[in-house]
């Protein structure tokens, strides 16, 4: 009986660690992404975030997000998006329906860029066929 309990506990621990370490995005060929990540990219574009953070998230007057997303958690990102950093010129997006609905996709997109898995430029849905050169 104790052996069975240990096996179940080990299995549960392994299963939870896999879920925790899973990427928040799915990407193929650098620019084909899952629907949530694609919506995050569209949110990035609609909000014109590149004006401060650069077209490739390299930073301009705002910090380089390809570096920042290596250091902050998803929860910290959410708090930052909602509250902003007014003292540094970062607006809050608490009143933005678009951000309220798509902040997780925006996080997934930026995390994928930060991880080097998603390339800069136009993204397409995972199921869209992409012409190979």
Q: Predicted segments — roles?
A:
Residues 3-4, 84, 100:
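Short glycine/proline-enriched turn or capping motifs at secondary-structure junctions
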Residues 31-42, 51-92:
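Gly/Gly-Pro-rich "capping" loops immediately C-terminal to redox-active cysteine motifs
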Residues 15, 43-46:
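Processing junctions and N-termini across compartments
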Residues 1-9:
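Bacterial N-terminal signal peptides that target proteins for export
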Residues 22-36, 46-47, 91-133:
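Flexible coil segments in periplasmic/lumen-exposed cytochrome c-class electron-transfer proteins
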Residues 8-17:
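Bacterial N-terminal signal peptides
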